[in-house]
């Protein structure tokens, strides 16, 4: 029997290149991957941060596809990880008597961030086409002296074509664990399921097709006043009601939710918040990446 589904994997190991001839140490990486993953050319910013776009060459996912994505940051690494295109999840295949509604496509993500390392994982949006079934899981282990920034942008259906999610489902589970010398401490857990029911519910998405999350977990000893100032600055820039934003302060970081009708508006909001996070951390100002949509004017 010929297999028709993808089973791809990608392993990325980042480490600080102390032998760099320049004044700033650069983060470099080693990788191992199979189709449909493809790594595009990496670059570096002025702080030696490795900027790596990842491409999914298959053009999308269907039921039964399984992707394994593993990222490891060695000590003193700085990484910006993104994707070169939106992830598309098509209507499920594999419908049978056993699975009358079809089969989920799945992606499992394992991330380990060692001491004094900083990962920004900013993939482009995931589009759930009509009847698409998708499940993603993230398990993140982070040291007490490291940070993790993650954005997750979901569009249910192609509203420009009058398409909704129909019987499709999006599931996501994010677990962030803080490592220390004595024990592992749960830092953040988030579990989401989006479907037609949540899309139409007045207390849910209320027919807003775009849902986004931004999670920033900072170093354990990061100043609480700086976190409060960060949230204050974000609220000064955005009217939370008008921009469909909800901002919360975590024990060590912030959580932001976006709900609206425009992926472009969500990207603009998250880019602005990213700039504010970079500023409060004392890092260089981020630049709009060349693999991202060109029509987005980032004028905040």
From Swiss-Prot:
Predominant cellular place of this UniProt entry's protein: cytoplasm
MF-aspect GO terms: nickel cation binding
UniProt entry keywords in alphabetical sequence: Chaperone, Cytoplasm, Nickel insertion
Superkingdom field: Bacteria
Subcellular location as annotated: Cytoplasm
Position of the signal peptide: none
A Pfam entry, by short name: UreD
Classification via InterPro entries: UreD
GO cellular component: cytoplasm
Function: Required for maturation of urease via the functional incorporation of the urease nickel metallocenter.
Subunit structure: UreD, UreF and UreG form a complex that acts as a GTP-hydrolysis-dependent molecular chaperone, activating the urease apoprotein by helping to assemble the nickel containing metallocenter of UreC. The UreE protein probably delivers the nickel.
Sequence similarity: Belongs to the UreD family.
Name of this protein: Urease accessory protein UreD
Species of origin: Prochlorococcus marinus (strain MIT 9215)
Protein's gene: ureD
């Amino acid at each position: 029997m010929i297999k028709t589904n993808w089973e791809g994997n990608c392993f990325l190991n980042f480490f600080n290149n102390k032998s760099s001839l320049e004044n700033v140490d650069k983060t470099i990486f080693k990788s191992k991957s199979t189709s449909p993953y493809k790594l595009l050319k990496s670059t570096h910013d002025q702080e030696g941060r490795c900027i790596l776009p990842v491409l999914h060459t298959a053009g999308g996912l269907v039921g039964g596809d399984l992707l394994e994505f593993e990222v490891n940051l060695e000590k003193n690494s700085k990484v910006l990880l993104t994707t070169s295109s939106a992830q598309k999840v098509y209507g499920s295949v594999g419908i049978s008597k056993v699975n009358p509604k079809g089969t989920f496509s799945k992606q499992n993500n394992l991330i380990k961030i060692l001491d004094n390392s900083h990962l920004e994982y900013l993939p482009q949006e995931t589009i759930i086409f009509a009847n698409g079934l998708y499940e993603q899981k993230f398990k993140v282990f982070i040291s007490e002296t490291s940070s993790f920034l993650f954005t997750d942008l979901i569009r249910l259906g192609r509203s420009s074509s009058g398409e909704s999610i129909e019987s499709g489902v999006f599931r996501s589970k994010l677990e962030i664990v803080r490592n220390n010398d004595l024990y592992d401490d749960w830092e953040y857990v988030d579990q989401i399921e989006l479907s037609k029911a949540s899309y139409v519910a007045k207390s849910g998405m209320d027919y807003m097709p775009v849902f986004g999350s931004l999670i920033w977990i900072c170093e354990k000893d990061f100043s609480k006043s700086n976190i409060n100032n960060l949230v204050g600055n974000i609220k000064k820039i955005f009217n939370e009601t008008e921009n469909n934003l909800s901002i919360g302060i975590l024990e060590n970081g912030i959580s932001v939710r976006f709900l609206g009708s425009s992926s472009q508006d969500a990207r603009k909001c998250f880019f602005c918040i990213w700039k504010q996070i970079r500023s409060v951390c004392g890092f260089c100002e981020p630049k709009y990446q060349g693999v991202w949509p060109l029509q987005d004017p980032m004028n905040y």
